[in-house]
Every structure is written in C-alpha cells, then in structure tokens.
C-alpha cells in the first residue's frame, strides 16, 4: 500500500521544479552549513570517504563538489585485458541481457523501446537491435562519475527531454517505460569492435547531466530532442580510452549501455548485484 502511494505521488509532484530547486541548493556555497549537510549525508548513506581524493568534508565548497567527488588514483583498477570491457560505474545491476529486436527488459511485466530510449532516432537504434544491454543504478552513496568500458570515438550525442521519475528499483518495477520516459543524454561511440551506446538517464533531484566534451547538457537544453554529430578528426573530434571519464551525474541516477549483436558477452552478473568501476563488465566475442 505504502509503495503504491509513493509511486502515485511521483505522477503528481512537480518533479522538474523540485529537481531544479535542489540543484540550486546543491550548487550553493554555504560554508559551515554545506559542510554540516555533507557530514549528515556521509553518515546517512555510509559513504566511504577513505576512497575520495579529498577525504575531509570541509574541503568541498558545495554539495555538488562533494557529490561528484574524484576518487584516489588507486581506489579503482581498470581491468587491463584488451578483450575485457570495464564496468563503467559503481552501482547495482538493474537488468541486463538481450535486446529483443527493439525491446529492452525493464522489470517483470515492463519492456520499453530501444528506439525511444535513443531519442526516437531509428538510424541510431538499428545497429543495436538484437544486441545486448545492461542497466546499472547508481545509489546516493555511490561514486557518480561514469567511465568508458572500452576505447571509443564519439559520433553522436542526443539530448532527450522527459520526465524525472525516481529510478529506484521500486520505480523500475512500477512505472512502465521508465528509462525511455525520463530525461536523458545518449552518447554513441564507434569502437574497434562495433558501436556502443551509453545512455545517462536523469531522475528526481538529479540537478544535471554532464559530459566531458560538452559540459552541462541538462538543463537547460529545452523541450525538444537535440542531436549533435561529431567528426572523427579535427578539434571537435572526441576520442576516449577505456577507463576515461565520460560524464557525471549531480545527484545520482542510472546508465544504460547497449552493444551491437555478437559483440560482447557479459560477465556473471544478475539483477541486484553490486558493481565496481573497473571490474570486468563484459568480454568481446570477436
């Protein structure tokens, strides 16, 4: 009963307004008040600050600085084997498996459209039909930067406006088409073995989504789908190596990774399993 009420409230609350207000508060530099809030957050969510580049909460001028904190260089090891893809985030597996033509599994009783996920762009979705997908949820305690599973040349980025439902496991079970409804940023890469899509999905109180090449993408792009294309050479070209930072969430969310058919086999993960940046995510089949 309580779960049903929580979901119902998400449909009627002004999620965008709340998220933007929280974003402004998280960006505020309020001295001791900011430090106090950070300490409360660390205690509430049991954040491991021993891994952080800056361990002292007082060293962060804003909550956003803390939330997108860097880790120490030796805190994560990127799997070295060239055949292995690196887990792109700390988090927990929501779902992973086969893309069945244009359909991605969300939770029991709920699938959603690959094409819709990628911004309603059939020309981008075609490469991934009957391929593989993995959805990973980042909880509040997690490190919130996203890294590359493998080397890739950026070809396309799509901003897709949408809702800002929570992306918690409960919401994934109850809200149809959740990841294809929420605001998101899609990045398409050419890799040595085929195409890879990395989809950064927004959520309630996610103040912004950033990429290393474009900075803040959301907000304030607007209410229309926006599609950027990138060259393979020149000053606007973007090439990222395995383990490089791709982007970050300010206040947490979910990533969906998609791969071409016959390109990868996932490591032994199941729904609910914890993930750690740099561990073996998948192995190339070619």
From Swiss-Prot:
Membrane-topology annotation of the record: Peripheral membrane protein
Molecular functions (GO terms): phosphatidylserine decarboxylase activity
Cofactor(s) named in the record: pyruvate
Principal cellular location given in the protein's record: membrane
InterPro entries: PS_Dcarbxylase, PSD-B, PSD_type1_pro
Active-site residues, Swiss-Prot/TrEMBL: 90, 147, 253
The enzyme's E.C. designation: 4.1.1.65
GO cellular component, one term: plasma membrane
GO biological process, one term: phosphatidylethanolamine biosynthetic process
Compartmental location: Cell membrane
Record's keyword terms, sorted: Cell membrane, Decarboxylase, Lipid biosynthesis, Lipid metabolism, Lyase, Membrane, Phospholipid biosynthesis, Phospholipid metabolism, Pyruvate, Zymogen
Reaction(s) the record says it catalyses: a 1,2-diacyl-sn-glycero-3-phospho-L-serine + H(+) = a 1,2-diacyl-sn-glycero-3-phosphoethanolamine + CO2
Cofactor mode of binding and number, as noted: Binds 1 pyruvoyl group covalently per subunit.
Lineage: superkingdom: Bacteria
Site (Cleavage (non-hydrolytic)): 252-253
Catalytic class of the enzyme: lyase
Pathway(s) of this molecule: Phospholipid metabolism; phosphatidylethanolamine biosynthesis; phosphatidylethanolamine from CDP-diacylglycerol: step 2/2
Family assignment from sequence similarity: Belongs to the phosphatidylserine decarboxylase family. PSD-B subfamily. Prokaryotic type I sub-subfamily.
Function field: Catalyzes the formation of phosphatidylethanolamine (PtdEtn) from phosphatidylserine (PtdSer).
Subunit note: Heterodimer of a large membrane-associated beta subunit and a small pyruvoyl-containing alpha subunit.
Protein name: Phosphatidylserine decarboxylase proenzyme
């Amino acid at each position: 009963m309580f779960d049903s009420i929580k979901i119902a409230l998400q449909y009627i609350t002004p999620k965008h307004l709340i998220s933007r207000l929280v974003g402004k508060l998280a960006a505020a530099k309020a001295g001791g008040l900011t430090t106090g809030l950070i300490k409360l957050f660390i205690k509430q969510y049991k954040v491991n600050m021993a891994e952080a580049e800056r361990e002292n909460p007082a060293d962060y001028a804003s909550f956003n600085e803390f939330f997108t904190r860097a880790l120490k260089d030796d805190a994560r090891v990127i799997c070295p084997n060239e055949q292995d893809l690196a887990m792109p985030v700390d988090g927990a597996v929501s779902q992973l498996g086969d893309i069945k033509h244009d359909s991605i599994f969300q939770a029991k009783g709920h699938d959603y459209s690959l094409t819709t996920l990628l911004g309603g762009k059939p020309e981008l979705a075609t490469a991934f039909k009957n391929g593989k997908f993995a959805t990973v949820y980042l909880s509040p305690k997690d490190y919130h930067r996203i890294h590359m599973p493998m080397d890739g040349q950026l070809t396309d980025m799509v901003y897709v406006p949408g809702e800002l439902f929570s992306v918690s496991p409960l919401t994934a079970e109850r809200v149809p088409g959740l990841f294809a409804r929420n605001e998101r940023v899609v990045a398409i890469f050419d890799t040595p073995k085929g195409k890879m899509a990395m989809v950064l999905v927004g959520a309630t109180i996610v103040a912004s989504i950033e990429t290393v090449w474009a900075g803040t993408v959301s907000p304030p792009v607007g209410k229309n789908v926006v599609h950027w294309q990138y060259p393979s050479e020149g000053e606007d070209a973007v090439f990222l190596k395995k383990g490089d930072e791709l982007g970050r969430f300010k206040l947490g969310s979910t990533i969906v990774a998609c791969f071409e058919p016959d390109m990868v086999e996932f490591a032994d993960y199941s729904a609910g399993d914890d993930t750690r940046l740099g561990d073996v995510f998948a192995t190339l089949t070619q």
